[in-house]
Amino acid sequence: MPSIDVVVAREILDSRGNPTVEVEVGLDDGSTGRAAVPSGASTGAFEAIELRDGDPSRYLGKGVEKAVLAVIEQIGPELVGYDATEQRLIDQAMFDLDATDNKGSLGANAILGVSLAVAHAASEASDLPLFRYLGGPNAHLLPVPMMNILNGGSHADSNVDIQEFMIAPIGAESFSEALRWGAEVYHTLKKVLKNKGLATGLGDEGGFAPNLGSNREALDLILEAIKEAGYTPGEQIALALDVAASEFYKDGSYAFEGKNRSAAEMTEYYAELVEAYPLVSIEDPLFEDDWDGWNTITAKLGDKVQLVGDDLFVTNPERLARGIEENSANALLVKVNQIGSLTETLDAVELAQRNGFKCMMSHRSGETEDVTIADLAVATNCGQIKTGAPARSERVAKYNQLLRIEEILDDAAVYAGRSAFPRFKG
């Protein structure tokens, strides 16, 4: 099999104008692979370490030259000669070279860039699309696009607490139809906001970011847009939230809608929302280390709605194993840069699926034109993907890749649709 011949890296810009790492891997048969690393705005405390330069004279301290040099001077020479298809061995070699628990020496952004670029090179050498190379012949499930069409929290300069208000086209017959429905609702929402004199500026992930009176108002506006676009809420298009509660948790309580609330009060609030709206999924409803609170909310709402651990699990198999053991959450958000390698990402997905947890493949708020997560969503048959609004090219690139994959699969393609959310009774 082809072996690694050269590894190069460079500093490029992400969708927020901040530097990130791009890596290219060349094999001795001429095959190449390239990958760019995303970056988050609301980051979990337990994520792998993203290496930044800290030099205020370059990119306000956010440069990634240290990570680039780590690839060129340390990782690359170590990996030359490795069989490119031995992904687990290659990733382990980088872990050993880094020799920390959180990838803080070489940087998760350096390690992940190489890890993904190797997979791209190996898939090219194997003459297979990435989703097929990683997922094998059973990779066939197209995910429900969880479109973040209204932004708040850390993703927008607005007074809305909840970070993401999403639509999920669960009633569509195909991914391409789901994408069309979502785009139509997105454009209709813009018209609804304009007619009410509300701002239509965009947040980091392409959703609108108006100042609203409450989080419920955001949900009501989206329901209005769904209906005005000609669709039935709950039957054709459902709603989903990313609360990102760790962002407004301080000193044991949640500063939410002008009040300090306990975990029990937040749980009651979510229970009211689940009764009032066609919600299929709530991500990070509580603080990332409030295991007791997560256990309580899962016991109360876990049979009615998907409860997704993002900051809670940070795509880390060890934290996920604790969540499974303690019945905390019932779904995993999958972000490759939280854990920092392809191998560990796939291990987390496998552990989740083996234990009855749903998985949602996810972008970050700081993205690039890299489309790897689209292939990963299909390779793992996870049935859900979160990659922003149907706007801004770094978001749309992933949706367009899924359209291509659907075309490649042809009659073998299955759209996850409503089956992705078995707990939803709406």
Curated annotation (Swiss-Prot):
Disulfide bridge partners, by residue number: none
Gene Ontology molecular function: magnesium ion binding; phosphopyruvate hydratase activity
Keyword Magnesium carried by entry: yes
This protein's pathway: Carbohydrate degradation; glycolysis; pyruvate from D-glyceraldehyde 3-phosphate: step 4/5
EC numbers: 4.2.1.11
Catalytic activity reported: (2R)-2-phosphoglycerate = phosphoenolpyruvate + H2O
GO BP terms: glycolytic process
Cofactor note: Binds a second Mg(2+) ion via substrate during catalysis.
Catalytic center residues: E205, K335
Annotated localization: Cytoplasm; Secreted; Cell surface
Main location: cytoplasm
Binding site for Mg(2+): D242, E283, D310
CDD domains noted in UniProt: enolase
Keyword annotations: Cytoplasm, Glycolysis, Lyase, Magnesium, Metal-binding, Secreted
Named cofactor requirement(s): Mg(2+)
GO cellular component: cell surface; extracellular region; phosphopyruvate hydratase complex
Keyword Lyase listed: yes
Residue sites binding (2R)-2-phosphoglycerate per the record: Q163, K335, R364, S365, K386
Enzyme class: lyase
NCBIfam families linked: eno
Function: Catalyzes the reversible conversion of 2-phosphoglycerate (2-PG) into phosphoenolpyruvate (PEP). It is essential for the degradation of carbohydrates via glycolysis.
Protein family: Belongs to the enolase family.
Record-given protein name: Enolase 1
Species of origin: Streptomyces coelicolor (strain ATCC BAA-471 / A3(2) / M145)
